[in-house]
Amino acid sequence: MSDDVQERLKGLVETHDVLLFMKGSPLFPQCGFSSRAVAILNHLRVDFESFDVLQDQGVRQGIKAFSDWPTIPQLYVKGEFVGGSDIMMEMYESGELAQMLADKGVVAAH
């Protein structure tokens, strides 16, 4: 991954409180995993930004090295990598995701 891509990714994850790197957009996800990630965030009423990795091959490959995680989608909260779709689902089902988002001041505690 080039330094330019690394700096761009760092800037993106630090600029947005909640950022989802995904395939497609929240309105038109291009894979089931991205769709599930969006559904989880929407259900928790999280205000989030998304980045469509299908529109930028450098970011699509770079984000995998940046996070040391091989798949998309990838969720970042307050600059910290949380995980992909499966981890999001596990955390959502256990209540851990809602608690983490509340602890970081992103959503109100339920």
What are these regions (language model features)?
Residues 1-10:
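Flexible, polar/low-complexity N-terminal or interdomain linker segments that lie immediately upstream
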Residues 4, 58, 83:
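Short, conserved clusters of charged catalytic residues that mark active-site
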Residues 7, 60-65:
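TIR-domain catalytic/interaction hotspot
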Residues 10-47:
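Local sequence-structure signature of Cys/Sec-based thiol-disulfide redox active-site neighborhoods
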Residues 21, 74-78:
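Acidic beta-strand-to-loop metal/phosphate-binding motif
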Residues 45-60:
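Thiol-based oxidoreductase modules, predominantly thioredoxin-like and allied folds used
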Residues 65-71:
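Thiol/disulfide oxidoreductase modules built on the thioredoxin-like
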Residues 77-108:
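Non-catalytic, surface beta->alpha helical segment in thiol-disulfide oxidoreductase systems
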